[in-house]
């Protein structure tokens, strides 16, 4: 399979280039960065593109890829419901093209989201803390937002988190994502980390995941690349590729 990388000079993108080049069953075609023409992907007969760019350009990238029949594995953040709907509309005209967008490709992070969803209905309270390097463009992270939504879905019909806070500084209790408080930390020295804290009478449960190096994303991305043709249309997350019940 012939694979190109968008954002190839970024920290994650460069890691993806190295990962593709090291895979015996994949052929690296080209790396594209800001200012480079996307047409190079067509010229090199690229079949699948890995996109780790920026929310400001990812939609233009996807429009080009879909129109040219190139599958996409996307780790870029900033996808709203409206953006996802637009991607689905573009894909209607290209039913054989596959796009997979994931908030996190680290296997441990995906498992932690799954475990949090399973635990959610068994605890009275839950909050999410995500911690990242200070160069991250979005807050909360896509992983934290998705985690919160999965938890909220699992807690449907349950009372909201007990919280007697009546006064305080704006934002002190975090962002509200479908009723789940999410707190964002940006700190030099961090890569990508998340804690989900559950509490109920007499006990707490903490589910934590740490990506200490960007190579943690490579196995999940390459899994998505290898499976991309099997799921035409838009797929969110890599959970379905991991056979999580």
UniProtKB/Swiss-Prot annotation:
Top-level EC class: oxidoreductase
InterPro entries the record matches: DapB_C (IPR022663), DapB_N (IPR000846), DapB_N_CS (IPR022664), DHDPR_bac (IPR023940), NAD(P)-bd_dom_sf (IPR036291)
Binding site for NAD(+): 7-12, 75-77, 102-105
Chain sites annotated for binding (S)-2,3,4,5-tetrahydrodipicolinate: 133, 142-143
Keyword Cytoplasm: yes
Keyword Acetylation belongs to the record: no
EC numbers for this chain: 1.17.1.8
GO molecular function: 4-hydroxy-tetrahydrodipicolinate reductase; NAD binding; NADP binding; oxidoreductase activity, acting on CH or CH2 groups, NAD or NADP as acceptor
Pathway: Amino-acid biosynthesis; L-lysine biosynthesis via DAP pathway; (S)-tetrahydrodipicolinate from L-aspartate: step 4/4
SUPFAM superfamilies associated with the record: Glyceraldehyde-3-phosphate dehydrogenase-like, C-terminal domain, NAD(P)-binding Rossmann-fold domains
NCBIfam families xref list: dapB
PANTHER family (UniProt xref): 4-HYDROXY-TETRAHYDRODIPICOLINATE REDUCTASE 1, CHLOROPLASTIC-RELATED, DIHYDRODIPICOLINATE REDUCTASE
Protein name per its UniProtKB record: 4-hydroxy-tetrahydrodipicolinate reductase
Species of the source: Mycolicibacterium gilvum (strain PYR-GCK)
């Amino acid at each position: 399979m012939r694979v190109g990388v968008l954002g190839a000079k970024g920290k994650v993108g460069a890691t993806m280039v190295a990962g593709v080049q090291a895979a015996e069953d994949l052929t690296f075609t080209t790396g594209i960065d800001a200012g480079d023409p996307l047409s190079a992907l067509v010229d090199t007969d690229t079949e699948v593109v890995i996109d780790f760019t920026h929310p400001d350009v990812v939609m233009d990238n996807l429009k080009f890829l879909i129109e040219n029949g190139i599958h996409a594995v996307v780790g870029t953040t900033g996808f709203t419901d409206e953006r996802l709907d637009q991607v689905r509309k573009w894909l209607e005209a290209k039913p054989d093209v596959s796009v997979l967008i994931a908030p996190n490709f680290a296997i441990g992070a995906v498992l932690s989201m799954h475990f949090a969803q399973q635990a959610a209905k068994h605890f009275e309270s839950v909050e999410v803390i995500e911690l990242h390097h200070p160069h991250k463009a979005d807050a909360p992270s896509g992983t934290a937002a998705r985690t919160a939504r999965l938890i909220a879905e699992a807690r449907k019909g349950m009372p909201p988190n007990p919280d007697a806070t009546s006064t305080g500084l704006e934002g002190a209790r975090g962002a509200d994502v479908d009723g789940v408080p999410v707190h964002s930390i940006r700190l030099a020295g961090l890569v990508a980390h998340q804690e989900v804290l559950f509490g109920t009478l007499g006990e707490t449960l903490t589910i934590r995941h740490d990506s200490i190096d960007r190579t943690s994303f490579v196995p999940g991305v390459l899994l998505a690349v290898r499976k991309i043709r099997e799921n035409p249309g838009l797929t969110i997350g890599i959970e379905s590729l991991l056979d999580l019940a």
